[in-house]
Design a protein with these regions (language model features):
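A surface/extracellular/periplasmic glyco- and lipid-processing/surface-interacting theme
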Residues: 1-171
Length: 171
């Protein structure tokens, strides 16, 4: 904060936060367990998340190996995963780099995943410059657990897998 003050940077904004983070722990009311999440982007690039019940975070894997932060050399983890499905297409920009465009204006479908559970959501964006709003299927803006969040935008036909064990407790 001191660096911001020294450089006369703004420390407040009139913009609404992108996600509705809440301090109280969000426990999704659903039977859909999400211990493993697999997102195939192509034949050679699949992202996988595995839930750790002790830390209540997901470890991220890319191309079959734990993803490691280059700067800190620590394993990449996240508290929340938001998956949205959007129509994608090749940009013919002459670069030859395989860049993709996304049709993300309107209402999209997806999932919110946290604490080993998943719910279906919608994502609404009214214009290119508008903020995306994430809602549950009842139309309420979702409450997101405090912590890191990965937003995964997937091709509309991606075969995302969300798996979980139906755990039972014995007394």
């Amino acid at each position: 904060m001191q660096i911001a003050k020294n450089n006369e940077y703004r420390t407040t904004t009139d913009q609404k936060p992108v996600l509705n983070y809440v301090a109280d722990e969000v426990e999704l009311e659903t039977d859909k367990n999400a211990d493993t999440v697999i997102i195939p982007y192509s034949d050679y690039n699949t992202v996988k998340y595995i839930y750790d019940e002790e830390t209540k975070e997901y470890t991220r894997y890319s191309r079959g190996e734990k993803q490691v932060d280059w700067d800190t050399d620590t394993t990449v983890t996240t508290k929340n995963i938001i998956i949205t499905f959007a129509q994608n297409y090749n940009l013919n920009d002459g670069s030859g780099k395989g860049r993709q465009g996304l049709d993300n204006i309107g209402k999209l479908e997806g999932y919110y995943i946290t604490n080993g559970k998943a719910i279906e959501i919608t994502c609404e964006k009214t214009s290119r410059t508008a903020q995306t709003v994430y809602k549950d299927l009842q139309g309420n803006e979702i409450k997101v657990n405090d912590g890191k969040t990965f937003i995964q935008i997937c091709p509309i036909n991606a075969k995302v897998t969300i798996e979980g064990e139906n755990k039972t407790t014995e007394e």
